[in-house]
């Protein structure tokens, strides 16, 4: 079950075992195989591109996402649409995942006071990865439209933050 977090289900199984509840091993196996969490490395195909949607918004979840990207790189270009809150550990988050990203697309989030400014994120990304392409957009919708112009069929687009 690559790309999915199983720790919560595993914890539930441990608790049930400690409480001496009877669990059917086939049901446990089936639950692990069927486990999926919307927004956690969720994969969709649209516009002939593979889209990964992940709510990764802290260092731990960004690190897991970076590992998943590295494990499934297969020479595929990976473009990121990234937005986050300004009070997050921005440098650390970007450093964790930057090696796997070919281009960054940073939308503004109008009306969200805590949202990180895309221009500030762009400066930080350029300091960490000077050669990578970075584009700022006024809205998330414009970032989605813009990424279609720089990506090609078969590319991966990771939307996270």
Q: Predicted segment positions?
A:
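Nucleotide phosphate-binding/pyrophosphate-handling subdomain across enzymes
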Residues: 1-103
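C-terminal helical cap/extension that packs against the catalytic core
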Residues: 6, 50-51, 59, 94-156
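Glycine-rich phosphate-binding loop signature in dinucleotide/nucleotide-binding domains
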Residues: 22, 72-76, 147-157
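Glycine-rich beta-strand-to-loop/alpha-helix junction loops that act as flexible
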Residues: 82-84, 109, 160-161
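Short, amphipathic C-terminal "tail helix"
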Residues: 89, 154-161
């Amino acid at each position: 079950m690559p790309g999915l977090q199983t720790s919560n289900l595993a914890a539930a199984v441990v608790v049930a075992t400690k409480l001496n509840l009877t669990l059917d091993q086939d049901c446990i196996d089936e639950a692990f195989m069927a486990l999926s969490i919307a927004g956690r490395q969720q994969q969709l195909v649209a516009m002939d591109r593979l889209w990964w949607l992940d709510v990764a918004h802290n260092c731990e979840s960004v690190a897991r996402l970076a590992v998943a990207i590295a494990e499934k790189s297969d020479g595929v270009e990976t473009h990121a649409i990234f937005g986050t809150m300004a009070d997050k550990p921005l440098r650390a988050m970007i450093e964790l995942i930057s090696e796997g990203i070919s281009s960054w697309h940073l939308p503004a989030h109008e009306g969200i006071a805590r949202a990180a400014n895309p221009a500030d994120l762009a400066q930080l990304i350029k300091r960490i990865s000077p050669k990578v392409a970075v584009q700022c957009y006024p809205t998330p919708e414009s970032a989605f439209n813009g990424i279609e112009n720089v990506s090609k069929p078969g590319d991966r687009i990771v939307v996270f933050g």
